[in-house]
Structure formats: structure tokens, C-alpha cells
UniProtKB/Swiss-Prot annotation:
Transmembrane segments: none
Task performed by this protein: Transcription factor that binds to DNA at the consensus sequence 5'-CAG[GC]TG-3'. Positively regulates the determination of retinal ganglion cell fate and formation of the optic nerve and retino-hypothalamic tract. Required for retinal circadian rhythm photoentrainment. Plays a role in brainstem auditory signaling and binaural processing. Regulates the differentiation of olfactory receptor neurons. During retinal neurogenesis, activates the transcription of several genes such as brn3d, coe3, cbfa2t2, glis2, elrC and xgadd45-gamma.
Any one GO molecular function term: protein dimerization activity
Protein name as catalogued: Transcription factor Atoh7-b
Designated gene of the protein: atoh7-b
Length: 138
């Protein structure tokens, strides 16, 4: 019958459960290494996620440049932006069958000066005209 305690000369890593106190340093060392590896993987995962959010923030319209959007706000803005673009494409497809110029006229007629100014962050109406092509070129 084999004893549960390690035989003299066996290494601490070969200990079986239940383990005497002499095996504890080897077990702690192993669990510490695993924890450090898991922490490093999680840190890399979070860095990748943060990089992805930074990339998304660059392409999502932002009302003000004074503060960075939170992750939640970034996702909300991305969803709204995607839905708006989908709506525009659907309408464009519907109007392209009849008169493509009518679709453009309809959208530009509905743009209010205040909306343009607040979106572009400008105060003067003549500045708005300068930014309109940039706004709709994406």
C-alpha cells in the first residue's frame, strides 16, 4: 500500500492530494504562474477592446469634441449612425427607381440651418455651406 506522503527524494511537484506543507510552495508557485498568465491575457484582451473602441470613436459622428465618448455612448452613437445610414440607403434605392435628383432635393430641403450649425459646431450660416459637402461625402 502506497503512502499519501511523498517518499524521501521525490520532488514537491510530484505530490498527490492531500499534500503536506512541504508541497505548498510548489503548488503556490504553479497557481501564481497561472494567475499571472491569465492576468496578461486579460490585459491584452482589454487593450484590444479599447483599441477597437478608439477606432469606432473615430468613425462615429460626435456632437462635441470637448470630451471623449464613453464606451456605452460610443455604442449608442454607432447604432444610431448605422440605422440612419441604412434608412438613407433604403430611401435612395426607392427614389433611384423614379428620379435620383428628387431624393437629393428632398434631403437637402429638410436640413435645417440650426441642425447644420449645431452638428458642425459653427456659428455663422455662411460657414455651414462650406461644411455641407464634407458632412454628406462619407
Amino acid at each position: 500500500m502506497k503512502s499519501d506522503s511523498p517518499v524521501h527524494g521525490e520532488s514537491h511537484t510530484e505530490c498527490q492530494s492531500p499534500c503536506p506543507l512541504s508541497c505548498m510552495p510548489a503548488r503556490l508557485e504553479g497557481s501564481t504562474k497561472r494567475r499571472l498568465a491569465a492576468n496578461a491575457r486579460e490585459r491584452r484582451r482589454m487593450q484590444g477592446l479599447n483599441t477597437a473602441f478608439d477606432s469606432l470613436r473615430k468613425v462615429v459622428p460626435q456632437w462635441g469634441e470637448d470630451k471623449k465618448l464613453s464606451k456605452y455612448e460610443t455604442l449608442q452613437m454607432a447604432l444610431s449612425y448605422i440605422m440612419a445610414l441604412s434608412r438613407i440607403l433604403t430611401e435612395a434605392e426607392r427614389y433611384s427607381r423614379t428620379d435620383p435628383g428628387e431624393w437629393t432635393k428632398m434631403h437637402f430641403d429638410h436640413i435645417q440651418e440650426e441642425q447644420c450649425l449645431s452638428y458642425m459646431g459653427v456659428r455663422c450660416p455662411r460657414d455651414c455651406d462650406r461644411y455641407l459637402p464634407q458632412t454628406f461625402s462619407h
